[in-house]
Amino acid sequence: MSGVMTAVSNRWDPGVIRALAEARHGDAFAVLGAHRTDTGRVLRTYLPGAERVSAVLDDGQTIALEAGPEPGLFAGDLPAQGGYRLRIGWPGGEQDTADPYAFGPQLSDFDLHLISEGHHLQLADALGANVVEVDGVRGTRFAVWAPNASRVAVVGDFNSWDARRHPMRLRHQSGVWELFVPDVGPGAHYKYQLRGPHGHELPAKADPVARRAELAPGTASIVADPTPYQWSDDGWMATRARRQAHDAPMSVYEMHAGSWLREEGVDLDWDGLADRLIPYVADMGFTHVELMPVTEHPFGGSWGYQPLGLFAPTARFGTPDGFARFVDRCHREGIGVIVDWVPAHFPTDAHGLAHFDGTALYEHADPREGFHRDWNTLIYNHGRREVSGFLIASAMEFLQRYHVDGLRVDAVASMLYRDYSRNAGEWVPNIHGGRENYETIAFLRRLNALVREHTPGAVMIAEESTAFPGVTADVAHGGLGFHYKWNMGWMHDTLHYAGLDPIYRRYHHGELTFSMVYAYSERFVLPISHDEVVHGKGSLLGRMPGDDWQRFANLRAYLGFMFTHPGRKLLFMGCEFGQPTEWNHDSGLPWHLLDDPRHRGVQTLVRDVNRLYVQYPALHAHDDDPSGFAWVVGDDAGNSVVAFLRKGKRGDAPVLVVINFTPVVQHGYRIGVPQGGQWREVFNSDAGIYGGANLGNGGIVTAEQQSMHGHAHALPLLLPPLGAIVLTPPG
């Protein structure tokens, strides 16, 4: 027996023992597992906490391994050929399992090449935690990109979070560490324990490519169920490209999933949200919902705009399958789903991407490029292939795996300009000495080109607040390739105008009309978003001046203007019924206000104007074509009146829109129109059903033969105070 013990002891190098025991050894596969010797093989295992270990050979023979000089070390001789399993005696019982170190490299060289080039569009099928079967053994393959780490181990509830138990293999050419762990399946919680390039231990990291995450404040990743979701939206997907074409109506209900409706202070899960939200959105006439970011994020107060889990729907509202069911049910009711997506920056939480492998891996090393002082976040290094590939794969994950119909890309301006929110000397110029971020421009172009290629019919929308040229121009023509861009200029100008006392509006008339100067420079969405009802800005209703009747009338007129102005529509939740207070993510919307006829009237107006917008092609078919709009009255600053014609394709009836932004009734206000006969008043924001005074034109107005505003006929109109009316010609 003493000879055997001596032989076993000689199998362990003292330096190796120390490195294993201190969780510092960077090449576990060189030590652990079965290795050939002159007489057969030697099997080494390191299982801290184990009391005994045996190797069970394929023929049933059991070989007891001898304990080594450090607790948890076991070794023994095996025949030169044949497989084996480990039988491990723990204090609480016995475990029979395959040896993780008996398996060869897992990821193919092609996968590793695609990862290194930033071209792996199904990145979460390679990296992250994937339940697989290897050589007849079921388990989970873990893989993480950490090229500068000196050691990486996977830790989890399957190994008591012990970093000594499952050190990983480095695939040197790619910087990817991998390990197949037998018997680990869906639901297992895990993280990665890394040491930096100089051997220092880093905080345990969540998996950047995890498809499921632990509910906050927990920060672990979870092995996702590999069972594919069974979709039932073939009809929607087959017609999506047509539904989301440039000439189709798009009216978006922007919402925060956690605060749309709270029942007894509890968030709805995805199924509960689908039960309540989808019928509401359909009844209100919106064509799409836009969800504020649903990727996993540690701080709820960020509303999702500081995410760390870019491949995992947040656990706050249920499982990934729950999110898929929500999207599926939206599609079955004809509602598209857009999600906000954040490829600009990420938070500094220790368990996240910050200094992931002990170096600035996902972020820029220079804080003049890599730190965003406005948000105290780190900025992605879009010039690094693996990082841009990681982000593009995240976009593809939601567009392809979850059938999402579009992404609204957050904070595009902050990415495009190197001097964004920085003073002189606080930013690094590009190679030509300029402020444009060439790496981000290349990233966005590639992202949008790939989305068009691989997810036809999906739309990409930019939240871009500057005059950067060509945001929605084709990549082939030098543009960024987005489908649509938020029209922040329209939003700022018109909200400022609407917030003025009507007596002063005559001096700011240009704020109402200037948007048409550049309306066709891009393809626009008109956004009244969450950003306009937070941070002390007040609510949309609260911005309106005057007493109660004026505020509600102003709001109704403004919404009438918005829904008839060229551009797709976006309205944040609560604005559709005139929420009087700022949005608070910790509280549900004040739905009880619908007991008040004034708020119910605003809601009814939004429902009707949505249907009007969809019903009349003139209001949407030529949003991007100057032929679809013509001023009739654009210069009546004294009366704060505007009138314009919206035109559709050949055969579509034009629509006349007239808005009076003063509280003065205008009697006999004459508007030139292109044809005579009886024009029908199809919308009046002062209608009693909306909470107005029912001042209007009785539904019908006869055009008189009179040359006016370049037309041969004129309509004598009564313009309600702070009111918008819409008329259609005979026929």
Curated annotation (Swiss-Prot):
It is an enzyme of class 2 (transferase). GO terms for molecular function: 1,4-alpha-glucan branching enzyme activity; cation binding; hydrolase activity, hydrolyzing O-glycosyl compounds. Its EC number is 2.4.1.18. InterPro entries: A-amylase/branching_C, Branching_enzy, GlgB, GlgB_N, GlgB_N_E_set_prok, Glyco_hydro_13_cat_dom, Glyco_hydro_13_N, Glyco_hydro_b. The active site is at residues 410, 463. Gene3D superfamilies: Glycosidases, Golgi alpha-mannosidase II, Immunoglobulins. SMART domains: Aamy (SM00642). Pfam families: Alpha-amylase (PF00128), Alpha-amylase_C (PF02806), CBM_48 (PF02922), GlgB_N (PF22019). It catalyses: Transfers a segment of a (1->4)-alpha-D-glucan chain to a primary hydroxy group in a similar glucan chain. The keyword Transferase applies. Keywords: Carbohydrate metabolism, Glycogen biosynthesis, Glycogen metabolism, Glycosyltransferase, Transferase. The keyword Glycosyltransferase applies. PANTHER family: 1,4-ALPHA-GLUCAN-BRANCHING ENZYME. Monomer. Belongs to the glycosyl hydrolase 13 family. GlgB subfamily. Catalyzes the formation of the alpha-1,6-glucosidic linkages in glycogen by scission of a 1,4-alpha-linked oligosaccharide from growing alpha-1,4-glucan chains and the subsequent attachment of the oligosaccharide to the alpha-1,6 position. This is 1,4-alpha-glucan branching enzyme GlgB 2. It comes from Xanthomonas oryzae pv. oryzae (strain MAFF 311018). The lineage of its organism: Bacteria, Pseudomonadati, Pseudomonadota, Gammaproteobacteria, Lysobacterales.
